[in-house]
C-alpha cells in the first residue's frame, strides 16, 4: 500500500463536485487509494483516529484525464521514449491537475514506437502514478491532412505494427488513424484485441468515416483540426462526428486551434457526455523552452501557440486546468460541464470506470481548485503528489 492513502478528506467550507452535483460540508473516506465512503455530514469522531485533510475553500473535483500528451517538462516522448521521460512528463502536467494521461507517440519509425511502448509498459509495471496507457497518433494518416506529422513516415499497417498494437502490457491502447488508410476489417481486428480506435488526420468522406465507426471506431482526435470539413453536400469527418451520437470527440480549447463558436457548435452536437478536453501538449509545457527540434525542422513558441517551419500549428502548450477554465468561462458552460469533459467523459471513452468521478468505489484522483479555478493540490490514488505554495489545509 502506498503511504498516506488511508485518510479522511473533510470539505468544511469547500465544495465537492460529485456525480455532476456540487455539495458542501461532506466527508470522503479513502482506503488504499479508493473512495470507500461519502458522508453528507461532518463529525469530529471520524477524524479522531485517522489522518485527514480539511478544505475550507475552493472546490474539489475529480482528477483530469488527458488522452493526448506528446511531451512536457522540456522533453518530447518521441525524442526520448524512456521511463524517465514519462516521469518528467507526468510531473510537468500534474501541477495543472492531470492525474491520468496517455503519453502520445506521433508518426515515426517503428523502432521509436516500440521504444515508446516499452517505456509505457515499464511505467505501468512500476506503477508510475498517472501513466495508464499509450496513444499511437499515426503513422496511418492522410498525407493531405497530416499537419505537422512527417510525410516520410506515413504508411499502412505492417506486421511490425500489428505485433505492437496487439500487446497486452500497455494498459489503454488508443490508436489514431485515418479511415482511408486502413480497411474496416483491420479496424475490427484492432478493436477485438481491446484497442480503442480514434479517427483523425483524415481527408475521408462521410461515408468512409461511418464505415469505420460501424467497424468499431469510437472517437475523433482533436475535432476540426486535421480532418475533412463539414459542407452542405459533403459532411466530411466533422459532419460524421456530429452525426454519430455514440462517439467521442477530443477538442483542444486553447483559443488557437478552435474558434469559440465552433467549439460551442461541437458541444451542442456532442454534449458534455461525448466531448472531451485534450491538450495535445508538446515539450514546452511546464518548462521555459521556447523552441525545439522536430524531425527535420523546428517548432517555435509564440505566446500560447506552437508552429513548425511551414507555419502549421504543431501541438500546443495547453494544460488541462486552462482547458477547463476556458470551457467553464469563455464558452460559459459552467464548472460542472467543463470538469466532466475532463474527467468522466474521457474515462468512459477509454473504458476506465474506476476513474473520472468522486464517488464510492472510484480511485481517489482529485484536484483541489481555488475560486479562480487554479490548481491548489493534486492527489493520485489517494497520495498527495502536488501542493501549491499557497495551498493550506485547515
Curated annotation (Swiss-Prot):
Binding of Zn(2+) occurs at 137, 201, 222
Summarize where substrate binds, as residue positions.
148-149, 225-226, 233, 254-257, 313-315
What catalytic reaction does the record list? N-acetyl-D-galactosamine 6-phosphate + H2O = D-galactosamine 6-phosphate + acetate; N-acetyl-D-glucosamine 6-phosphate + H2O = D-glucosamine 6-phosphate + acetate
Annotated catalytic residues: 280 (proton donor/acceptor)
Primary location class:
cytoplasm
Q: Please name the GO terms that the record assigns under molecular function.
A: metal ion binding; N-acetylgalactosamine-6-phosphate deacetylase activity; N-acetylglucosamine-6-phosphate deacetylase activity
Question: What's a GO cellular component annotated to this UniProt protein?
Answer: cytoplasm
Entry's localization field:
Cytoplasm
- What Enzyme Commission number(s) apply to this enzyme? 3.5.1.-, 3.5.1.25
Q: What class of enzyme is it?
A: hydrolase
Q: Which GO terms describe its biological process?
A: N-acetylglucosamine catabolic process; N-acetylglucosamine metabolic process
Tell me the keywords, alphabetical order.
Carbohydrate metabolism, Cytoplasm, Hydrolase, Metal-binding, Zinc
Top-level taxonomic group: Bacteria
**So what does this one do?**
Involved in the pathway of N-acetyl-D-galactosamine degradation. Catalyzes the conversion of N-acetyl-D-galactosamine 6-phosphate to D-galactosamine 6-phosphate and acetate. It can also catalyze the conversion of N-acetyl-D-glucosamine 6-phosphate.
Give the family this protein belongs to, as stated in its UniProt record.
Answer: Belongs to the metallo-dependent hydrolases superfamily. NagA family.
Q: What else is known?
A: In Shewanella sp., the active phosphotransferase system (PTS) specific for the transport of GalNAc and GalN is replaced by a set of GalNAc- and GalN-specific permeases and kinases (AgaP and AgaK, respectively).
Q: What is this protein called?
A: N-acetylgalactosamine-6-phosphate deacetylase
Q: Which gene encodes it?
A: agaAII
